[in-house]
């Protein structure tokens, strides 16, 4: 029976008679200890095979090769006659990785760090590298300024040679910056330079961007900010010589010292443009033109390069190369720019494709395209298509990608990748005010009906004072040229008295249609025709109301003994011709971050109507991004309206302008801003209502003129994950507005009753507050809390409002 011998030991004691000078011929190879690793995989990693002559060098190489696979903790090679026996001890497999104590860093980031070290579930765990794993994670924390963090890896054995790897973190506190020193600055003070940093040694309470917690990445960003600051002001030789970061003994404080060389300011002496400009040299040279003697500016140079690339991109040169070299003359402190341009190949579009539109039909997206298939690639046209898709409001995100066609030197495919959002909604509106209590609204809206791009909606309100219903539909592409067609039918039964408005009941129904005509990429005109029937009953003697009735030829009686005798009933059938202009270049349809939207609309009664008047409204919004990410946005909105009678008739009081509420001036109850009703209180001695005394009230009656303005600072929602940034929006706002009646007559009777002059537009109401909008899976939710800052007698506050709905 053959004796197994440890080959390494045997070789040390070898003799030619046992192994031979050239080793032995391997007739078989056996493995002992394999569990997870397949025999075939182990054999492939070995340098020797059956039939080979094994030498001591081969055996050593075999051991090293098996260790190199990372699958084994121990390897031994034995000889059993002419057979090689390989004894191994496999490393355990990581069954799970868990974390404990990590509050400052998310698990996803820690897993990415481990993955970079080759530590992941399903892989073998090398126990000898545990300390390296711990140190790698600690270094990761150090880069975030948490120098007192410790990491302990706990390995728990499991059946079948598996282990659970648990990483326990003791984070401690973040190291705070005690002082930032800049050495070598002469043209600018240290405070002036540090004021542009994210990292600060002192952070005022109002600065929501500054941070005293040290982070390596933020320091790198601040260094780039410092470099750009100097380069943009002519310091072409500026250099950051060294950066020193010192840690206090308790690891809680950081001292940062930046050593810089400012150099002198340099001026531009001119530009030289050369290279392949694809026949657009005149346009490129115009973009590269500078004024000799102006200060060198690094930001302008970068913009110049980007402008040249964009110019060439509009002509189909998708991948141009533009590089700028500086010729610095230290003697006269000037810089000449040498701009090298290589337009490259001109590309044509083979296909325009869409991905991610599972509901919306391709034709709906394709009709928004300005880049045509078969034409040369125009980067501006591709961008216009992206903007138009965003503006539809059907998608959470829209991304574009230009893919080169394999085997073609001059063809590309343009791919629009969209992520659809829920465009249908069933909304229940809830409002709560200190005086109004709770009210409800209901609505169904589908902005992308069956993926056709058509809008279909039904809305209704049912409460103690109103029953309202409206059915509407709009086809934005009624014709292939983009002419839109819309229509609606509505019914409204309204008791103004129960709504704390002027006393009357209104039953109204009507139908209307609108045609819209695009006149440019962002401008459109629309024309409409509407029919409206109004029945007014239970009208009580009120100055504005009676003045209107008198203008249309109705002279209500003045009788005080019977309330019913003082009522007046009135019906009107009106036909309106409406006209409007609109402009829209917002970057997306919902939650915009840049651009403007404006509209000017008007309507006028046509012959055959019982009323004769016109009404004009203007509404404009503008968004200014304050950060590249679009998280910080300044929004301003202005609205104005005016109406006046024709042919000696007054504007119907029931079609007045109103303000107050969630869509106008938040913090005030809906429709309560502006003129209030003044009721006649006649007695038996009065024969004309104009002779009657009047009483003031808090019932809103509206006015024929309106002006409203809002300013909002849109900001990141605190404690919210970045992935929800496109569905949640928080803002601080200030609203202001007023409604007035230009035909109001401030008589002795109204003055005696203490009624203010309602023709004065200066009675402006102001409120401020905070708002949150959320496109939640359960539906759109809007929350606002506002406090009136400036109010007048009779105004009614409503601080808290929210809407909640269901989307599909």
Curated annotation (Swiss-Prot):
Residues 1-20 form the signal peptide. GO terms for cellular component: Bam protein complex. This is Outer membrane protein assembly factor BamA. Part of the Bam complex, which is composed of the outer membrane protein BamA, and four lipoproteins BamB, BamC, BamD and BamE. The lineage of its organism: Bacteria, Pseudomonadati, Pseudomonadota, Gammaproteobacteria, Enterobacterales. It is found in: Cell outer membrane. Belongs to the BamA family. NCBIfam families: OM_YaeT, PRK11067.1. Residues 24-91, 92-172, 175-263, 266-344, 347-421 form the POTRA domain. Keywords: Cell outer membrane, Membrane, Repeat, Signal, Transmembrane, Transmembrane beta strand. It comes from the Bacteria. Part of the outer membrane protein assembly complex, which is involved in assembly and insertion of beta-barrel proteins into the outer membrane. Constitutes, with BamD, the core component of the assembly machinery. GO terms for biological process: Gram-negative-bacterium-type cell outer membrane assembly; protein insertion into membrane. The keyword Metal-binding does not apply. InterPro entries: Bac_surfAg_D15 (IPR000184), BamA/TamA_POTRA (IPR010827), D15-like (IPR039910), OM_assembly_BamA (IPR023707), POTRA (IPR034746). PANTHER family: OUTER MEMBRANE PROTEIN ASSEMBLY FACTOR BAMA, SORTING AND ASSEMBLY MACHINERY SAMM50 PROTEIN FAMILY MEMBER. Its main location: membrane. It holds the Pfam family Omp85.
């Amino acid at each position: 029976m053959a004796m197994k011998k440890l080959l390494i030991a045997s070789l040390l004691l070898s003799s030619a008679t046992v192994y031979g000078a050239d080793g032995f011929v391997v007739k078989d190879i056996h493995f002992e200890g394999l569990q997870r690793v397949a025999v075939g995989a182990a054999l492939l990693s070995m340098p020797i095979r059956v039939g080979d002559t094994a030498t001591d060098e081969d055996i050593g190489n075999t051991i090293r090769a098996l260790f190199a696979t990372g699958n084994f903790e121990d390897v031994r090679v034995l000889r059993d006659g002419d057979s090689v026996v390989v004894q191994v001890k496999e490393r355990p497999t990581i069954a799970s990785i868990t974390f404990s104590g990590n509050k400052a860093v998310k698990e996803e980031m820690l897993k990415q760090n481990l993955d970079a070290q080759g530590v992941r579930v399903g892989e073998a765990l090398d126990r000898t590298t545990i300390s390296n794993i711990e140190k790698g994670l600690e270094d990761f924390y150090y880069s975030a300024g948490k120098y007192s963090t410790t990491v302990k890896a706990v390995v728990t054995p499991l059946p079948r040679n598996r282990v659970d790897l648990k990483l326990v973190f003791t984070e401690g506190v973040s190291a705070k910056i005690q002082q930032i020193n800049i050495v070598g600055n002469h043209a600018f003070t240290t405070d002036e330079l540090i004021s542009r940093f994210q990292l600060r040694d002192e952070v005022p309470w109002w600065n929501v961007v500054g941070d005293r917690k040290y982070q390596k990445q933020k320091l790198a960003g601040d260094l780039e900010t410092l470099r750009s600051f100097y380069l943009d002001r002519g310091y072409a030789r500026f250099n950051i010589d060294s950066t020193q970061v010192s840690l206090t003994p308790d690891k809680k404080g950081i001292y940062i010292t930046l050593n810089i060389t400012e150099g002198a300011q340099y001026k531009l002496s001119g530009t030289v443009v050369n290279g392949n400009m694809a026949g657009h040299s005149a346009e490129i040279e115009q973009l590269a033109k500078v004024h000799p003697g102006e200060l060198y500016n690094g930001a302008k140079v970068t913009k110049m390069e980007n402008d040249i690339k964009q110019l060439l991109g509009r002509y189909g040169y998708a991948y141009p190369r533009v590089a700028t070299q500086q010729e610095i003359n230290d003697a006269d402190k000037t810089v000449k720019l040498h701009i090298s341009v290589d337009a490259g190949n001109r590309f044509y579009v083979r296909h325009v494709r869409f991905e991610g539109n599972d509901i919306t039909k391709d034709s709906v997206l394709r009709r928004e395209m300005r880049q045509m298939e078969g034409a040369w690639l125009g980067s501006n046209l591709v961008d216009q298509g992206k903007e138009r898709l965003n503006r539809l409001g059907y998608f959470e995100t829209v991304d574009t990608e230009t893919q080169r066609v394999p085997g073609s030197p001059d063809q590309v495919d343009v791919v629009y990748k969209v992520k659809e959002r829920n465009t249908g909604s069933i909304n229940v509106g809830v409002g709560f005010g200190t005086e109004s209590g709770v009210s409800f609204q209901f609505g169904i809206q589908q902005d992308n009906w069956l993926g056709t791009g058509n809008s279909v909606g039904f809305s209704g309100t049912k409460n103690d004072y109103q029953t309202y219903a409206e059915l509407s539909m709009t086809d934005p592409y009624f014709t292939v040229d983009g002419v839109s067609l819309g229509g609606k039918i509505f019914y409204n039964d309204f008791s103004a008295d129960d709504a704390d408005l002027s006393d009357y009941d209104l039953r109204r129904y009507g139908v209307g249609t609108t045609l819209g005509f695009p006149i440019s990429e962002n401008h459109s005109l629309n024309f409409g025709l509407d029919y409206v029937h109004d029945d007014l009953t239970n009208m009580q003697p009120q100055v504005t109301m009676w003045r209107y009735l008198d203008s249309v030829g109705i002279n209500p009686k003045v009788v005080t003994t019977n309330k019913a005798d003082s009522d007046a009933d009135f019906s009107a059938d009106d036909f309106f011709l409406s006209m409007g202009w609109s402009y829209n270049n917002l970057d997306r349809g919902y939650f915009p971050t840049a651009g403007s939207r404006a509209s000017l609309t008007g309507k006028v009664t046509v012959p055959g109507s019982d009323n004769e008047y016109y009404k004009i409204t203007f509404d404009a919004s503008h968004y200014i991004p304050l950060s590249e990410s679009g998280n910080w946005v300044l929004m301003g909105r202005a609205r104005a309206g005016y109406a006046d009678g024709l042919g000696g008739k007054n504007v119907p009081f029931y079609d007045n302008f109103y303000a107050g509420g969630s869509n106008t001036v938040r913090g005030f109850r809906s429709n309560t801003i502006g003129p209030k009703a003044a009721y006649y209180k006649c007695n038996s001695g009065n024969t004309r209502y104009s002779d009657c005394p009047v009483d003031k009230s808090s019932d809103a009656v509206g006015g024929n003129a309106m002006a409203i303005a809002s300013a909002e600072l849109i900001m990141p929602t605190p404690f919210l994950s970045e992935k929800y940034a496109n569905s949640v929006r928080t803002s601080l706002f200030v609203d202001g507005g007023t409604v007035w009646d230009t035909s109001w007559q401030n008589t002795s009777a109204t003055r005696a009753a203490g009624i203010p002059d309602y023709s004065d537009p200066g009675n402006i109401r102001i409120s401020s507050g905070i708002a949150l909008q959320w496109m939640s899976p359960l539906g759109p939710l809007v929350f606002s809390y506002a406090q009136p800052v400036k109010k007048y007698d009779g105004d009614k506050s409503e601080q808290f409002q929210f809407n909640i709905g269901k989307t599909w």
